[in-house]
Amino acid sequence: RVFRKNIKVWACADRNNTFKESVQETLLGKSTSVGTGMLPMSRGNAPGIVDIVTKPNTGGMVDLIVVKSDMSKQPSIISSRTYEQGVKAFYGAAVDAIWEDEESDSTIHNECLLRTMTTQGIVILTYTPLHGLTPLTLEFKETATLLTEGMD
C-alpha cells in the first residue's frame, strides 16, 4: 500500500526490550549503524529518517522516528508503543498504520483496529502463536475458515 500523504504510524511490541531488539532494529538497523534497516537516513532532500527521539531511561529505545517522504511536504511520524503500557496507551489517536509485533491481547488489538477506522488505515500483525489458540489467534482461524469455505 502506498500512502500519498504524511502518515502517523505506531510500531508496537510487548516490552521495551523486545521493541528495541526487534522492531527498532528492523526499522533503523543496529544502533551502531542507524539507517541500515528498512528506513534509510535522509541525505539532503532525499526521503528517509530526519530525526529520532529516544525514550528516557530505556537504554536507547526509540520513542519517535521522523521520516521525510517524497509524497508529502510534511514528515511522517512513527511512534513506539508497548503492550506492557496497557490499553490506555492505545487510546484516542487516529492512526494510519499500526504494526503489532508479537501477539497483543484482544483489548489492545481491538483498540488498534479502532485507531485506524477513521483513516481507512491498516493494522499489520507479525507473530507466531506461541501461546496456543488464544482468542486473537482463534479469531484469525475462524475468519480464514469462513473465507476458504466460500472458495469453490
What are these regions (language model features)?
Residues 1-152:
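Phosphate/NTP-binding elements of NTP-utilizing enzymes
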